[in-house]
Amino acid sequence: MKTAVIIGGGLGGLFTGAILSKEGFKVTVLEKNTTAGGGLQNFNRFGMKFDTGMHVIGGMHRGGNIYRICKYLGIIDKVSLKEVDNNCTDSLYFSEDKTTYCIGKGKEGFIDSLSEHFPEERDNLKKYVDAVLGLTEEVNLFHLRPSSDIFPSHSTDFFLAADAFIAKYITNPKLRSVVAYMNPLYGGVGDESPAYIHAIISSLYLQGTYRFVGGSDSFADLLVSVIEANGGTVNVNEGVEWVEVNNRHVDCVRSCKGNSYKADYFISAIHPCTLFTLMPENAFPKAYRTRLNSIPNSYSAFSVYIKLKPNAFPYINHSEYYMTKYDEIWNFGKPSKAWPLGFLFMTPPEINQGKYADKALITSPMLFEDVIKWEDTTVGKRGVDYETWKDEKTQHLLNRVEELHPGFTACVDKINAASPLTIRDYYGTKEGSMCGFSKDYKNIPLSQVPVVTKVDNLILTGQNNSLPGFCGVPLTAINTAEAILGRNYILHRINEITND
């Protein structure tokens, strides 16, 4: 039996481990935190459970790409999801003109809902949606299609910046901003983020949006169960402290518990720049290390987790996005004295969700430079001035939510806040980046980090290799597994099992 040790038990590590274990590998996952899951992790405060990430997911409709991967793994019937409202999958509020836009489900719902506000743009919206879907057709992996093209050809749209792609099809400046509202989900930056990434994320949510019910950790548990059912283990509280490399070959890894692990293959599911700190300098060519260390990281976030008073605030079955000004939609990655430029507000669903919400979440993009003065501190030891700063930022967000929902603050019972430092220290991501390496249409290969490395039995996985998020990371896990098992091997297996 072939063996694999996976460094990091986040979404990428667990999906890769589950796939390899299903294909006969004995898998050991080493995770530094008390629970596995990365962005699927929860924490407990005030007697309730809060999700740290993966609040809104796509690709889980019947026949969707992540649905099919879960079916292949044998867990789809155990995933607990709640679909958001069909007539309003998301709502967008722009403070600038006090306008709210509700986005309908599906291609027609999207076009119809926005045509109500911009009737003269209906034909352009149709062309835009067709162009979005057309771009996804250029990415075979997104559709789980086997491909023999190592260097596939692409359209001119594929190589545009996302904002330029939108402007090519949409004339009205306000509507351009509206259709770009999801760009924080991929770390969007104006004149930088590639159009194809915007298209992939947008098309996911066109097809239906879901939420985990009762906590996203239940999904992490399902992936762990696949690994364990096939003879593998997921060891928490056991981060890797050293990767022993000789002659471009990993001999073993050593954990914080002093244990040494050998395997046929080693897979790193942590940020590549973090991996470098665990290895000898000569493990990789200097040019490779320099290149990866020079790639900018996407921005981070500041989040507020709220316990609500009983029967005080209604459960809202869709996400609400708040924006200050239309022309700020692409500026989340730029320094601004006007923070927050925007945020996501939602009420996560509980099992047997009733009329009223028990908790709420506010999360707003934030740059790591906003917390740079505390970068050398650790969790729980950042000082009084840091706590004061967090309180101020929290109040800024609460004041904005009051604009959406007058009287909301009176419904709040208790509050906990997390900054980019929290994300950095718990997720192990450089600068608390939410979406890994930034992607730039002007130099797409720079941030397309291959899963294979110059170390012959070390392979990478996770959001830094290709696409971020709940869709991108599982797709990269397929690439990682196929680097071992052979091109298209997993895709053929998925299609065999799911093409019914």
Show the residue positions of the predicted features.
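Helical element adjacent to the flavin cofactor pocket in flavoenzyme catalytic cores
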Residues: 199-250
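Active-site-proximal substrate-binding core of FAD-dependent oxidoreductases
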Residues: 486-500
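Mid-domain catalytic core of redox enzymes
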Residues: 211, 241-355
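C-terminal segments that line or cap access tunnels to active or ligand-binding sites in enzymes
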Residues: 311-418
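N-terminal glycine-rich phosphate/pyrophosphate-binding loop and immediately adjacent elements
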Residues: 2-127
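A conserved FAD-binding loop/helix module that cradles the flavin
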Residues: 463-485
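Rossmann-like flavin
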Residues: 96-192
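A glycine-rich dinucleotide-binding beta-alpha-beta segment and adjacent secondary-structure elements
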Residues: 174-186, 403-467
